[in-house]
Amino acid sequence: MKHRALHPIAIVLLSISFAHAEDWPQWRGPSLNGVSTEKNLPVKWTTEENIAWKLSMPEWSGSTPIIWRDRIFLNVAEGNDLYLWCVDRTKATVLWKKLLGSGNVKMRKQNMSSPSPVTDGRNVYVMTGTGILKSFDFAGKELWTRDIQKDYGAFGLNWGYASSPLLFEESLYVQVLHGMKTDDPSYVMRIDKKTGKTIWKVERPTTAIRESPDSYTTPGLLRYGKTTEIVITGGDCVTGHDPATGKELWRANGLNPENNPSYRIVASPIIFNDIIYAPTRVRPLLALRAGGRGDISTSHLLWSTINGPDVPTPVTDGKYFYIVNDRGIMWCLDAKTGAEIYGQQRLKPGTYSASLVLADEKIYVTNEEGLTTVVRAGPKFEVLAENPLNDYCLSSPAISDGQIFIRTATNLYCIGKK
């Protein structure tokens, strides 16, 4: 497997870790926004054609595989138990499996393996929907373990916990935004990645009611100038926090203008350069300018749209902003102004839950039947290919070293050249 030199732009994008462009170290990839700098990626495939290998999986999951060089890590449910798998990328074999805990529960599109692992290239960190958070080295040695529910109380989300940790420098950032099944406050916490100890834990207040405090999103990382902030969406608002202390620096309301009691949020915040894009339950999606303090609901609002997604997280290259809703309707907007470039273009009918990824001037969109539509990036809607895997799929694609990895209910596929 060849390794490419890093483009200077990629160094800026990937400064959150030591990852190379060919790695996919966390759910939304090397730049934390679903964008990869990879080139010459596969465009067409079937279950038998253009498949480098496939590995049998015991269960479906919303968790995305993460990749570092020749290692792939997966959060896996096997019956009642939950495991971290380490897979040899070159041999398509399981190197080791480590038990994370038991108590797997299935709830519609959710089970307790939904959070994706993260890695810094030395160790891997994984959380389960049951609140178990563990660290392992690449040989499978357990370094530390936490039980977040035991420490801070039971999770109270209607559909179970699904947020992935955010890894930044020497810390993990974990959010627990809930309210449907608990009166306990929502919170955000920072954990030392070396020891597993809590550095800080702050409450995140909300006026959202019933199910609307619940958030299945993953924290985002905003970097502009010399400033770094942790971005959290849920509970009818989006907030920015100081990584050093957890202090809330700014807040934008408006994600639930009608105070709908069932406005839980699934799609995660997208950050590109100095713009924060905050989806909610379809409408509205807000675009906010970085740099604000206090209430920025109006002062830093760049644009909004009523044509947001529910489950799939959108993607942007900084020029165009791409949205696919749960029914497979696609929009392209101007990323800076929100002006519609094209709208209501229908992909193949189906239900869409996986998040969009963008690479090689293409957008990859996978539906729940395992069909990936490849759309040319740019101002003109053009479908390049429709690629069926004919299997249940909730997991988002991962891209690494010229190959695409898609996890279905029965297989992990490595797509591309062997």
Annotate each predicted stretch with a short phrase.
Residues M1-A5:
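Positively charged n-region of N-terminal signal peptides that target proteins for export
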Residues H7-S17:
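Bacterial N-terminal signal peptides
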Residues H20-K418:
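Noncatalytic, solvent-exposed loop/strand surfaces
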